[in-house]
């Protein structure tokens, strides 16, 4: 029987990529980023591989939410007024290690440029992701997923998107950044 080197290369490539495929399949929400980690290889995803629904990938950056507070979704308040109190970061993401995380508002976290108070801009990207979810700008994860990520980071020091994979604060910030336009 004639040799089929093309099939062997395909099978070999498949075996090498299987870890990536298994990782993506193990946490469905994390498989659906708007941009690949490199930000340019495969571009934006339009649909989830496990659903026929269109994936909404219109996430905005921390800078957008900082500069456009009038676009914040209902129930999220950038500043305190006579009618409502500004939404505190700790109300959504409790038990933070820094003063900013413990007492600051969502807007304070977006505005902060202090790496000691918001390492890797993790808090700013969490706030942006939270506002993106609440305003239906992204549909591939939920507030509950964001809260789990935060909980695991402060409890264990990392978030595990899949078995055997550990994302530390910088990794989570990079992932969340990849969901922003």
Q: Which residues fall in each region the model found?
A:
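N-terminal secretory signal peptides and thylakoid transit peptides that target proteins
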Residues: 1-18
């Amino acid at each position: 029987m004639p040799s089929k080197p093309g099939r062997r290369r395909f099978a070999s490539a498949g075996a090498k990529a299987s870890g990536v495929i298994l990782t993506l399949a193990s946490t469905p929400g994390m498989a659906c980023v708007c941009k690949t980690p490199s930000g340019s290889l495969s571009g934006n995803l339009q649909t989830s591989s496990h659903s026929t629904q269109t994936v909404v990938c219109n996430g905005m950056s921390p800078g957008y939410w900082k500069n456009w507070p009038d676009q914040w979704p209902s129930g999220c308040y950038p500043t305190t007024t006579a009618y409502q109190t500004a939404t505190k970061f700790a109300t959504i993401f409790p038990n933070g290690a820094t003063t900013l995380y413990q007492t600051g508002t969502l807007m304070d976290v977006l505005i902060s440029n202090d790496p000691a108070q918001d390492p890797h801009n993790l808090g700013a990207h969490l706030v942006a992701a939270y506002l993106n979810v609440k305003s239906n700008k992204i549909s591939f994860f939920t507030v509950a997923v964001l809260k789990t990520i935060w909980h695991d980071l402060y409890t264990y020091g990392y978030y595990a998107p899949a078995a055997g994979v550990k994302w530390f604060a910088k990794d989570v910030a990079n992932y969340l950044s990849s969901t922003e336009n």
